[in-house]
């Protein structure tokens, strides 16, 4: 979207605020509400945020990004904190240090695999989108002729052709991001049925109170 680095960092703050708020909420309601329902809420919020992100465009406002970031942060907070509690609830106290190390390792490996897959798909879909959009760049394109007539593009110079190619690349990258967001939305939705396989912890407070849960 062409935002400066400082603005990008500022737009990421609401997601962290949402995650922090969800963590505080989990600590308050954890003993009273089944943790599996909290994970379900988190997965649903994450899927909702991903769905909203599939509606993004190159003209998306900062408010839309901020609002979506808050929803996504709430979803992540309601997923990982209860999930950690459930994971350690049946683990003997003397195994919690080893369990925390293994839990963090698996989580980091999973995150690395997911990020790598999304980046690979992004690169592939960007190239495919660029090739598809480039097919509309020809002398008989009405939209292109109108853009040239109003001075948006200059096809008579190398600089103008480079600008046109950059715009095609920008549009292709946006489409690729939307495809990634759509895939992540389906991953979140498909993860919801697996919550039924989790056991209800007998004592959430005893598991959540362990210092070994910190990453």
Segments predicted by a language model, with ranges:
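Transmembrane core module of solute transporters
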Residues: 1-98, 207-215
């Amino acid at each position: 979207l062409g935002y400066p680095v400082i603005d990008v960092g500022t737009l990421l703050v609401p997601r962290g605020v949402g995650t922090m708020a969800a963590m505080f909420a989990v600590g308050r309601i954890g003993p009273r509400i089944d943790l599996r329902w909290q994970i379900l809420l988190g997965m649903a919020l994450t899927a909702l945020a991903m769905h909203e992100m599939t509606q993004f465009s190159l003209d998306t406002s900062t408010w839309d990004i901020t609002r979506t970031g808050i929803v996504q942060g709430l979803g992540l907070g309601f997923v990982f904190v209860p999930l950690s509690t459930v994971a350690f609830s049946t683990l003997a106290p003397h195994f919690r240090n080893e369990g925390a190390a293994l839990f963090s390792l698996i989580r980091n490996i999973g995150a690395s695999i997911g990020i790598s897959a999304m980046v690979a798909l992004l690169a592939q879909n960007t190239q495919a989108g660029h090739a598809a959009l480039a097919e509309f760049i020809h002398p008989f394109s009405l939209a292109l002729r109108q853009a040239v007539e109003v001075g948006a593009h200059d096809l008579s110079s190398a600089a103008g052709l480079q600008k046109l190619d950059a715009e095609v690349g920008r549009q292709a990258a946006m489409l690729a991001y939307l495809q990634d967001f759509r895939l992540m939305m389906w991953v979140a939705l498909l993860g919801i049925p697996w919550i039924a396989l989790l056991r209800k912890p007998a004592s959430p407070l005893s598991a959540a109170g362990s210092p070994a849960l910190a990453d």
